[in-house]
Amino acid sequence: MAGNTIGQLFRVTTFGESHGIALGCIVDGVPPNLELSEKDIQPDLDRRKPGTSRYTTPRREDDEVQILSGVFEGKTTGTSIGMIIKNGDQRSQDYGDIKDRFRPGHADFTYQQKYGIRDYRGGGRSSARETAMRVAAGAIAKKYLREHFGIEVRGFLSQIGHVKVAPQTIGDIDWEKVNSNPFFCPDESAVEKFDELIRELKKEGDSIGAKLTVIAENVPVGLGEPVFDRLDADLAHALMGINAVKGVEIGDGFAVVEQRGSEHRDEMTPDGFESNHAGGILGGISSGQPIIATIALKPTSSITIPGRSINLKGEAVEVVTKGRHDPCVGIRAVPIAEAMMAIVLLDHLLRFKAQCK
């Protein structure tokens, strides 16, 4: 199975399955002499890990990361950084009923058809549990971006189902508030509505989709490589690679369909840009404005409501998903999306420094 690596100069490779012994990753390209320890990585993992609130899966994992290599006397050496997280709360017996059945809406069918074998326990490699290592790698990228370039990468949940967060102006977002509630939401009124909606869904045994926004501030001009390695193209690739993501928007995204050129173009004055409809990227290259990306995540198919499907023999069957699952996967996706944006930005920054300055 290929496709486990992202990046060119800053490269991240992950491995492991949902119910395997452990998850791990190799991070190549981290510049030397960056002060780094598990304490720099753990906070983002704690934001993503399961079992932290009543709104997410009850599976409880400590998600304690261990650095295996690439750090000496508290600083990166420039060699590959190896990290691992051990799994501890697997209940593989919950998945015995779907060993020979395909859960509708999941990767069960496609993995079986492609490889002729699949790890049915919790989805195996296709499980969002794999993203823990992306978050670990992303924490390193975020630290380097922050300390060496002053770049901040942060995200918030902007919609669950029909409940939308009030429009946010970047400079007015209260990031402490975002990180103080289980929904990563800057709008207190929306938090209450999110709570009601998730409680209702849990009673019904159903799930719901979500939308979240990621913002990178203080990104310099010049990141991105025409024509196939455009910064927005690489961001879209990275964000689409997150489990359950079905759509990515940069800047105004699909709203540009209804805009006119006189409205959409980001006009400039000697003092700078007057708007940011493009989301901080022009011609595939960063413009110096905040980079804004929005992603849409589908409702998880792991629900207790019976669904029609087939088994390995192609026979019609009914599937009821057991186990422990998130009623809305978008809630824990905020730190994952931040990580993917940070990984792409650091990769492009290193490429920019190698080529241009």
Swiss-Prot record:
Its EC number is 4.2.3.5. Residues 38-60 are annotated as: Disordered. GO terms for biological process: amino acid biosynthetic process; aromatic amino acid family biosynthetic process; chorismate biosynthetic process. Its cofactor is FMNH2. It catalyses: 5-O-(1-carboxyvinyl)-3-phosphoshikimate = chorismate + phosphate. Keywords: Amino-acid biosynthesis, Aromatic amino acid biosynthesis, FAD, Flavoprotein, FMN, Lyase, NADP. Homotetramer. This is Chorismate synthase. PANTHER family: CHORISMATE SYNTHASE. It comes from Haemophilus influenzae (strain PittGG). Reduced FMN (FMNH(2)). InterPro entries: Chorismate_synth, Chorismate_synth_AroC_sf, Chorismate_synthase_CS. Residues 38-49 have a biased composition (Basic and acidic residues). CDD domains: Chorismate_synthase. Belongs to the chorismate synthase family. The gene is aroC. Pfam families: Chorismate_synt. GO terms for molecular function: chorismate synthase activity; FMN binding. One of its GO terms (cellular component) is cytosol. This reaction introduces a second double bond into the aromatic ring system. FMN binds at residues 125-127, 243-244, 283, 298-302, 324. Pathway: Metabolic intermediate biosynthesis; chorismate biosynthesis; chorismate from D-erythrose 4-phosphate and phosphoenolpyruvate: step 7/7. NADP(+) binds at residues 48, 54. Gene3D superfamilies: Chorismate synthase AroC.
